[in-house]
């Protein structure tokens, strides 16, 4: 686990974040997954945090995120879910709307947990093995 030095503080903050497709419909194809990961990486870069691990199953996504104390979790997740939903619905709308109605890609809720240096490797492996279950 990497320790970062800021002006007047030192930190190491990581979160395991999970959210699901609306109605848990299995709509995340390989093509959608690849584009989703591109979009999320750009959002993280634009907002000054890092996605250390990212993997999906057909109906949900797992992220391991590294951020600073200035990042507010609800704002990070709002940006990740909101921008990705808008862009994916724009690019894959015809395909997605077959299973999703009302124009919503993501379920409004999410899971977030802090990650310690003792659990980081376990979380990484868990995320990496999502499709292998």
Regions found by a protein language model. Give the residues of each.
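Basic nucleic-acid-binding interfaces
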Residues: 1-133
């Amino acid at each position: 686990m990497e320790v970062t030095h800021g002006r007047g503080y030192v930190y190491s903050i990581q979160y395991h974040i999970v959210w699901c497709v609306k109605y848990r419909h299995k709509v995340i194809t390989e093509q959608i997954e690849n584009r989703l990961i591109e979009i999320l990486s750009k959002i993280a870069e634009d907002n000054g945090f890092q996605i250390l691990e990212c993997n999906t199953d057909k109906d949900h996504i797992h992220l391991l995120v590294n951020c600073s104390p200035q990042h507010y979790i609800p704002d990070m997740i709002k940006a990740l879910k909101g921008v990705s939903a808008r862009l994916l619905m724009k690019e894959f709308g015809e395909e997605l709307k077959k299973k999703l109605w009302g124009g919503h890609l993501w379920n409004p809720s999410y899971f977030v947990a802090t990650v310690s240096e003792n659990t980081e490797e376990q979380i990484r492996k868990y995320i990496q093995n999502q499709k292998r279950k």
